[in-house]
Amino acid sequence: MQGSLNSELTSLGKSQATKLATKLASLNLDKIFSSTATRASQTANLIFDDQPIIHSDDLQEIAMGNWEGKTYTQIKTESPKEWFNFFKDPFSYTPSKGGESFDDLEKRLKKFIDHEQIKSMTGHIAIVSHRITLKMLISILQQDKALFNHIDLDPTSLSILTLANDASKIACLNDTTHY
């Protein structure tokens, strides 16, 4: 589990980001946001080259506490109930020591949305972040907490939401046709 561990982007991640950059080359963006995690920042830099990027700690992946750095098998063996809740009933998940609950993540992302005035922005923005964080962000913008359990996002996938009048519409979700 990575969680909030700071790691470098893998060679596969670099390849996927470069391919996504080609796909998005003609898109004019008004703002680009990225998690401050090294792997997300490297992804954003590969995709958006010399464009200015606003880094935010609020876009970090959910903190996994003492699960970070362990394998799925280790965690499932040590904490079977919490492992189940994490994947099947995330809002009942109690984080390990130093970890973050899904409610905490939701509050953090709502703070980001409010601080950056995401809902009232016009134009095109990009957000480079992490799987669980992006799933939560999409659920918040869709105003559908239950949606979190029904979407999955692959690494370096493309999702597009259209925001208007304090509502959002999913135009594209988890597009990986660029790789």
Task: List each language-model region with its residue ranges.
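Short glycine/proline- and acidic residue-enriched helix-loop micro-motifs
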Residues: 82-104
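Loop-to-helix element that buttresses phosphate recognition and phosphoryl-transfer chemistry
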Residues: 1-43, 97-110
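Phosphate-coordination/substrate-recognition cap region in phosphate-metabolizing enzymes
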Residues: 18-83
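Acidic, low-complexity terminal tails and accessory targeting/binding regions
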Residues: 49, 56, 62-74, 118-123, ...
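Short amphipathic alpha-helical/adjacent loop interface patches that line ligand
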Residues: 17, 79, 90, 109-113, ...
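Catalytic DNA-binding helix-loop module of base-excision-repair DNA glycosylases/AP lyases
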Residues: 133-139
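Generic beta-sheet signal
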Residues: 121-131
